[in-house]
Amino acid sequence: MGYNAGSYDVIVIGAGHAGCEAGLAAARMGSKTLMLTINLDMVAFMPCNPSVGGPAKGIVVREIDALGGEMGRNIDKTHIQMRMLNTGKGPAVRALRAQADKFSYQHELKKTIEETPNLTLFQGMVERLIVEDGECKGVITQAGAEYTAKTVVITTGTFLRGEIIMGDLKYSSGPNNQQPSITLSEHLEELGFDLVRFKTGTPPRVNSNTIDYSKTEIQPGDDKPRAFSFETTKFIMDQIPCWLTYTSTETHRLIDENLHRSAMYSGMIKGTGPRYCPSIEDKVVRFNDKPRHQIFLEPEGRNTQEVYVQGLSTSLPEDVQRDMLRTIPGLENVEMMRTGYAIEYDAIVPTQLWPTLETKKIKNLYTAGQINGTSGYEEAAGQGLMAGINAACRSLGKKEVILGREDAYIGVLIDDLVTKGTNEPYRLLTSRAEYRLLLRHDNADLRLTEIGREIGLITEERYERFTNKKLQIEQEKERLSSIIIKPRPEVQELIRNIGGSELKDGIRASDLLRRPEMTYEHIHLLVPSEVELSDEVKEQVEIQIKYEGYIEKSLQQVERMKKMENKKIPVDIDYDAISSLASEARQKLKDVRPLSMGQASRISGVNPADISILLVYIEQGKIARVSNQ
């Protein structure tokens, strides 16, 4: 027998990385919010890699922070190591990566949630949604509690009909042997949602005391203080190294001999796995010309002996995993503490979502994270933040927020999902962003802080610091553009020392900085600023001046694209009435229901001829609309 358990503005189902961001954002925006999760001890749990960031993903964490989200602040307080990646490359692909103390990460984020006003955290399993007249009105739990809400956000991760697989062993489970969610998945199918079956995996964990680190290569963190959050002022300098080793020919032989026992190759696994995070079996088979593969040994925290064996994701049986580990240099006598496994789960086809992450089938229902077909904590957190923001906006009667591809990697991620869909777990890559020179690690605050403030997630104090930083950047750029550096002896000597060509005439300081061998610090030696500038301001000045031409070119591309984005398509347009559209294009347009000509042009199967026909049709005002009957 059910009972009325309360009424909320926003209900979030799940408390993983998507759910935490969704719940915190909604509550901080002023919505009365409830977070429901199967197990309170698993809030913000890291079931796979104990790390945050990396190429593209690290930029997403910066974007989450710039908008007022929590992931960046939380990892800054709880990491054991931090490194800037791709420092030898251009600014567009640089990214920060932190090794997490996964237990501290969980503890700190749960504490933040518990202390946040407007936010209630409760342990309970949601089995059904309350849906009336095509609108979501709340949820019903396994215990019969009925919670009503203006909006609901589903962030169930890999729990929907989750199954763990190792060799020929297969059983119903969420990650890390947690209770899976079976009934909710079945209920979503009843409501008419198309679901797909995806798979991901995790490697074994081993005991640090049984590793011979002398046979591995140390991978220390950066000496320079690093942080994801623009608010962080206290840095953790007591870092713990990771270690690099490699598989051996014996490892590969053992895998080859036992491929028939791998769930990946025996037919036990039906779900599609992540292309960019293959299992060790997959790597050995697909890249059989390579004599070895990298293995990183990553501590799971400061107060545990568990070490994550990065690069050894597997669905081989337990006995093979133990033998395989002991063929790796440094792990000859290792003790395995947890086995690796594959996990299959249900995800919804993401083209069933609007760019706000609201479902098209049911109003006021949003989804975020791995349920949308993505992989990765960062991708989940970015979606969770946007779903939470938009659910709160709907509940408060405010305009919803959609980030464009030119605004953020989060915008690229969501647009790819809702426009193109995905037939495998989606991972964000820098190559997916056509405006990646604009979407850098260093300028996330310049891109998104204004939006964060408008929606109420950025404090006035933080906004004031941001505007001061912006002003200092502009003033320093103007100063360098107005100063002429003459070919004095000390100038020529500095240029010679760094391998540059001597000056023939005077040159603007900004033009001298554009030379590839020149840095801001070199210019500062020649024409020092009277104002003390932070490293972040100096970095912005250098990048904006050095790459000005390329940035300008990208901005022109954005303006051309915006013309297409500004050509809106009515939501209720009847594509069947446009007889000259190709049949494939018509079906894809009906499935995705793009909101603009720009979005329509990115749908696979819709070619330029179809776009031209659609454009003419709309501009002539011949809009046949689908009947609401």
Curated annotation (Swiss-Prot):
Biological processes, Gene Ontology terms: tRNA methylation; tRNA wobble uridine modification
Primary localization: cytoplasm
InterPro entries assigned to the protein according to its UniProt record, in alphabetical order: FAD/NAD-bd_sf (IPR036188), GIDA_C_N (IPR049312), MnmG (IPR004416), MnmG-rel (IPR002218), MnmG-rel_CS (IPR020595), MnmG_C (IPR026904), MnmG_C_subdom (IPR047001), MnmG_C_subdom_sf (IPR044920)
Keyword set, alphabetical order: Cytoplasm, FAD, Flavoprotein, NAD, tRNA processing
Cofactor entry: FAD
Pfam families membership: GIDA (PF01134), GIDA_C_1st (PF21680), SAM_GIDA_C (PF13932)
GO MF terms, alphabetically ordered: flavin adenine dinucleotide binding
Positions of NAD(+) binding: 273-287
Localization, UniProt: Cytoplasm
One annotated Gene Ontology cellular component of this protein: cytosol
Ligand binding (FAD): 14-19, 126, 181, 370
The keyword Metal-binding is assigned to this record: no
SUPFAM superfamilies: FAD/NAD(P)-binding domain
Homology family: Belongs to the MnmG family.
Function (record text): NAD-binding protein involved in the addition of a carboxymethylaminomethyl (cmnm) group at the wobble position (U34) of certain tRNAs, forming tRNA-cmnm(5)s(2)U34.
NCBIfam families: mnmG_gidA
Full protein name: tRNA uridine 5-carboxymethylaminomethyl modification enzyme MnmG
Organism: Bacillus cereus (strain ZK / E33L)
